[in-house]
Amino acid sequence: MNESIIYLVPLLGILGLLVMAIKSAWVSKQDAGETNMKELAGYIADGAMAFLKAEWKVLSIFVVFAAALLAYSGTVHKIGDRELHSSWVIAISFIIGAVFSALAGYIGMKVATKANVRTTQAARTSLKQALKVSFTGGTVMGLGVAGLAIFGLGGLFIVFLKMFNVVEVNSDQMKTAIEVLTGFSLGAESIALFARVGGGIYTKAADVGADLVGKVEAGIPEDDVRNPATIADNVGDNVGDVAGMGADLFGSYVATILATMVLGQEISVADNFGGMSPILLPMVICGLGIVFSIVGTWFVTVKDEKSNVQNALNLGNWMSMGLTVIASYFVVNWMLPEGTISLRGIEFTKTGVFGAILVGTVVGAIMSIVTEYYTAMGKAPVNSIIQQSSTGHATNIIGGLSVGMKSTVIPILTLAGGIMGSYYCAGLYGVAIAAAGMMATTAMQLAIDAFGPIADNAGGIAEMSQLPPEVRERTDNLDAVGNTTAATGKGFAIASAALTSLALFAAFVGIAGIDAIDIYKAPVLAGLFVGGMIPFIFSALCIQAVGRAAMDMVQEVRRQFRDIPGIMEYKAKPEYEKCVAISTKASIREMMLPGGIALITPVIVGFIWGPEVLGGLLAGVTVSGVLMGIFQSNAGGAWDNAKKSFEKGVLINGEMFYKKSEPHKASVTGDTVGDPFKDTSGPSMNILIKLMSIVSLVIAPYIVGIGSTDKSEACCMKEEIIKCNINGQEYTCKSKEKCDSIMNATKKDIAELTGLYNVDGAHSSLGFSIEHTIVDTKGSITIDSGYVYLDAATGPKIFMQLDMTTINTQNSMRDSHLRDKEEFFNVNKFKKATFEATEISKNAELGEFAYVAKGKLTIKGIVKEVNLFFNYQGTKPDKDNINIAGFVGELSVACKDFGIKMGGIAKVEFTIEAAKPTN
């Protein structure tokens, strides 16, 4: 195995962290301004750190408890007859993921609270310098998140390869290594959920409280130093849009790579990396994305005061994306082998893999462009809300809701096209690698996102410090661009979450051994509906939490205005710390229930109703959550920029309107309603769908078979099989009762059967069903020969031989691939498959006359012990008075156990007639 490429991955992460440290040191060296500016920045920094400490105190208890459960689950190595690839080390992986996610948030928070006041001071000199400081602060956040993710994943993967002595890609040891690695993603996503929800509640409780009393009731400007909630509001920008967004994208980044690795482990290729290229490819591409994100930052600069800041950010973003795509082309061609690659029956080439990466990049770009259109100032959607503000508060709300709902159309169509395009390029691996391609430049995306709240804080400090108007004009310029980048960042995050969740879903289906998600089944359909409901109740709880916390904030601000004389005259200083404490306590208290729903629901559904119903739940959550996330984020962003448009003046029906006008007051109401939409519940949707998917992936090995109807439907064995052939008579089982009544009338005790019976291939049949994405591939194979010999003295003997050259799935091209290709059945070399058994016993769990034959199945020269379940249907003379015995049954085999790179579990059903020789 060429191990050099494996060690390159964490090294790329370390490179990102080194550049992050250099840029962080540069930010710290910049001038922090006058004493009063430093004092205000100190309040913000102290409030932000107080929140993090309070949050970590609570989450540390959760992490210890969850790690203990995971450690216990890792000691379970067998359920029934099924071996598990588990290890207690998953608990360590979980803790590291949680710590790295928290550390990513801390790094971002720390540098943001340093960069804000330094951006304010830089704005006293020029727009160019202010952009440089604020964007460098954002870059520290971006590189910290991406560097920690790549370093953590790459480093742990190397450790686990050594720990579990992995020598083959398709080995049980590799399965264990990757399943343990899922703990890292679970830890990251768990912390991300609480950081995003808690941070969102914090920031919007402070924002809404500050706006309602400060701007609406007291009539003072935004970020006015006299407003007791203004420090909490500025702290909230860091808590929600820096730490929350950082943890969010850290989780997406890790989950995307991990989902691709899980699917890559199912692929068997002959390459120069020991068959590991499909597993390593997403890590290498994302690692190179860090390098090109660093290069992209060099292009983010402006020449003078009239330069367009948005264009500068876009140039850096497009450069990093373009360079990453170009590099991906060469990396894919270098790492992946020539010829066809197969995953679950879908064949593709390395050209298709690159095509999928390109599709993912294009989808991410389109999502950002569309989000910018619906939320940016000067665009038609925002202008429509401005116009509707002229007729009152209600029409402003109606306009914003309409814009948010319409904004789902193009993104959903884009996502649908991206899913289909990437799937056609490279199957489910293509969908996963498309998400990885989209996330590759996360460092740059997050740098642009984090720049926004830094600029917002800088403007707040300028306002509170009463700096000259030109300073506030420069910070407002940056802030306006920051609002748009924050909105586009949320669109990007939702798009990545959608593709990531689909990739995680595909990985879950493979590990859980599900053939298909059949929504015709009542439990699955029920799960689908419940899943669709969860984002609504989750959003309701988040918005309700903001409302409750905002009420407490409003009461506190009113109390201070009432009880502290001289605040409005600048003679007394407000008690900022009390408002900070209200937001902190409320966010910690209120985040627990939504977080609990996301974590516990998949566990309850999976362990009670099984993986198929859980699959239905995940499908409902994903579709509903993506729609809710896009709608709420875009509606909130549009309301926000509609309000901000009044600062420079807007033209409504030929008349100019400014701040404090009636239309402006209506826009403030809309912005207040939109705040929890765009900064709390909306952004939380993408973590919700990812976290529920990753929890399902982690528990998948433990819920295999739960909810299965194998034991209750004896003749059909699986409820998907609705027809039985018993002694030449075909029956249709429309219900369990009907099925049982038929079988009870025909089942016999095999003890009555003695002697030799030769299998009659002409009157016997064998069908198979192999999972193929969501829909099964069904086919048949001819039973070539065989016999059943029963003798009390010598013991039973069963032998069956299959003619593998007769594989038939009603598709000539697919049949040719299945028969001829080495990664499938390779019938030119292995023409026959056999089953031999010398032990038959009753299986009381399946019924009084149900039996299990324990024997050896040989396919492609590979021998595995299997259990064949069957019912003896009795004997009956044919027209020539030859005694005929009948058998029906099934067995299940894992395709990979026999070197077949198609699907997961193959279900085999058979009906056999065997004739007793006449002499």
Model-identified regions with their sequence ranges:
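Low-complexity, acidic/polar, glycine-enriched regions of mature
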Residues: S741-N919
